[in-house]
Regions:
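N-terminal flexible/basic segments that precede or flank functional cores
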Residues: 1-10, 71-72
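Short amphipathic helical patch at the helix-1/turn junction of helix-turn-helix
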Residues: 4-5, 16-17, 45
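Short basic helix-loop element that most often maps to the first helix and adjoining turn
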Residues: 9-27, 53
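Residues in the helix-turn-helix
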Residues: 24, 35, 50
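Recognition helix of helix-turn-helix/homeodomain-like DNA-binding domains
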Residues: 30-45
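DNA major-groove recognition helix of helix-turn-helix/homeodomain DNA-binding modules
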Residues: 49-64
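Short loop/turn motifs enriched for small/polar and acidic residues
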Residues: 67-69
Length: 72
């Protein structure tokens, strides 16, 4: 469950760092505010395509890393 929590935390932190409400992010991305809420509450799993749209709406890029277990 940790990777899912990390994605949720990163999404919320990024949105807040850009001083955006869920509604404002929804308007910028065309993604319904209810869907953003579900993502942030962990009741919906995002696709990479959806995460990319969210990142672009926050004027950010999406970066995904594979990290060896011993470095965690």
């Amino acid at each position: 469950m940790q990777p899912e929590f990390d994605v949720i935390r990163a999404l919320v932190d990024a949105r807040i760092s850009q001083n955006l409400t869920q509604k404002e992010l929804a308007e910028k991305t065309g993604i319904h505010q209810a869907d953003i809420s579900k993502l942030e509450n962990g009741t919906r799993n995002p696709s990479i395509k959806l995460l990319k749209r969210l990142a672009e709406g926050m004027d950010m890029i999406l970066k995904i890393e594979f990290i060896p277990k011993q470095k965690i």
